[in-house]
Amino acid sequence: MFQTVTAPTGVWRGRVTGDVTVFHGIQYARADRFAPPQRCEPQLQHLVEVPEPGPIAPQSPSRLEGVMGAPSSLKQSEACLTVTVTTPHLAQPGSLPVLVWLHGGAFLSGSGAWEQYGAEQLVRETGIVVVSVNYRLGVLGYLCAPGISSGNLGLLDQITALEWVRDNIEAFGGDNGRVTLDGQSAGAHSIVAMLGIDRARSLFSRAIIQSAPLGLGFHSVEQARRAAEIFEEELGSDPRRAVVTDILAAQARTAHRLAGRGAMNSAPPFLPVHGMAPLPFVGEWNGKVAANAARRKILIGNTRDEMAAFFGPHPVFSAMRRVPLAGPQLAGAIQRRVQKVVFDNPVQEFADRFASAGASVWRYGIGPLHPDNPFGACHCIDIPLLFGDGDTWRDAPMLRPLSPKEIGESGTRTRRYWGEFVHTGRISDPAWPMHRPKSRYAHLLTDETIGGSA
């Protein structure tokens, strides 16, 4: 069964499954290599039907496949600027709030079209419209090299996708005046960047910031150009004409060089760049973040053991843990310290900054889903609480030994909270108070107590 929607920029046919319709592969922009995205011209004379997920951005396998499991294999293409829209079947135009999802992946991997980000269960339980975004990654999205690319193309893609939502989502049942921008990891990092970008200011009124590695910051122009120089050395040819496989191989070698001895620096080699459009220099950006956060509704938090996803498989720390007695203690202490620097302390700082600027802020935490899993509450364990279903995630190492039924049930509370926030911009649970500056309280979404008192 199918449903056809006519929007200002096109006519699309989606597949109906029960009471939910999914529209795959809707193109929101076009872009030549290293060029800013250009909005697509309206194509109202042609019906577009994409029964399966469209192509994803060129990328190498995610470094977190050993935690999340491998995603379904999807075609890769530079023509990847598409969204997936999931909506209640036959929703009245403009009637429902919208959640726009920005995937993570260290700005190197990921896709809004991955099966793990399927939004059918979330839409069915909450009655919202979900838009999942593909954007350019790695060198093709964030290279900052004079004469080749100004950088921040992936960020521009995301903003252009939000503009597509503003102009078209009403036809799919969404209310463009009630848009919540939600992202995890690099996607959440992007949302924080957008809070300081004027062009993005009016495109969403609510934000959900999940496990943003805010301690990494963004690149300065100097840092970005140094990464570009290393990449160009590794590529050995003009990136404007190189084949994608060569670009990805040189990108991997660049990451290896920047990681240093023992691969101890795991920061992404390519990030949004302060001082290159549309992201202001850091001083101006800080001021804009404070101004743009005022009167917004923001949900922000992270997991208890973010770094376990990175330290668990890391060869240096695997060897350290094998040292009798002191080894596991030392590895654990280093992991906890890095967790505080990259995640815990910056999340606290930004929650305080947002609240001090006049935003309504709620802070959450996530503990382990099963006591016997060695990854604990690692980075990305929040995703199956929202997206996919038990069968989608059944092979994820971070969720063992949970059954598909237990995986599906583990996210019921989180999906209920997220649905309420997207609908109302608030959390009504009296046990979850609004964040006050300097409060250490984070409301736990799993069955364990962390954080301080409210």
UniProtKB/Swiss-Prot annotation:
Induction of synthesis: Up-regulated by PQS.
Active-site residues, as the UniProt record annotates them = S185 (acyl-ester intermediate), E306 (charge relay system), H379 (charge relay system)
Instruction: List keywords of the entry alphabetically.
Output: Hydrolase, Plasmid
Q: Which reaction does it catalyse?
A: N-octanoylanthranilate + H2O = anthranilate + octanoate + H(+)
Q: Does the keyword Hydrolase apply?
A: yes
Q: Which GO terms describe its molecular function?
A: hydrolase activity
The keyword Hydrolase is annotated on this UniProt entry: yes
Q: Which domain of life is it from?
A: Bacteria
Q: What is its EC number?
A: 3.5.1.-
For this protein, the record's InterPro entries field holds:
AB_hydrolase_fold, CarbesteraseB, Carboxylesterase_B_AS
Write out the similarity annotation: Belongs to the type-B carboxylesterase/lipase family.
Q: What does this protein do?
A: Involved in the degradation of the Pseudomonas aeruginosa quorum sensing signal molecules HHQ (2-heptyl-4-quinolone) and PQS (2-heptyl-3-hydroxy-4-quinolone) to anthranilic acid. Probably catalyzes the hydrolysis of N-octanoylanthranilic acid to anthranilic acid.
Q: What is this protein called?
A: Probable N-octanoylanthranilate hydrolase AqdA2
